[in-house]
């Protein structure tokens, strides 16, 4: 039980031929082949895209430093400022 005997496959083939007709079966197989080819190419493209993204280095974050304006200009903070 569970496996199909050759008789089951033969009956299934006859039913498919009767339902779809002999002329439509090659067209259906051709269409299925094209669809699988397109699907495979899209999967391959996505894999290449992921590999390209992984190979790109992530930029290092810029470290900001706080500069005291009075120390940067060379003036002492005790000097009087003009009004």
From Swiss-Prot:
Which GO BP terms sit in this record? protein transport by the Tat complex
Q: Does the keyword Transmembrane apply?
A: yes
Show the InterPro entries listed in the entry. Answer: TatA/B/E, TatA/E
GO cellular component terms attached to this protein's record = TAT protein transport complex
Write out the function statement from the record: Part of the twin-arginine translocation (Tat) system that transports large folded proteins containing a characteristic twin-arginine motif in their signal peptide across membranes. TatA could form the protein-conducting channel of the Tat system.
- Family per similarity comment: Belongs to the TatA/E family.
Q: What is the designated name of this protein?
A: Sec-independent protein translocase protein TatA
The organism is Mycobacterium tuberculosis (strain ATCC 25618 / H37Rv)
Lineage of producing organism? Bacteria, Bacillati, Actinomycetota, Actinomycetes, Mycobacteriales
What is the gene called?
A: tatA
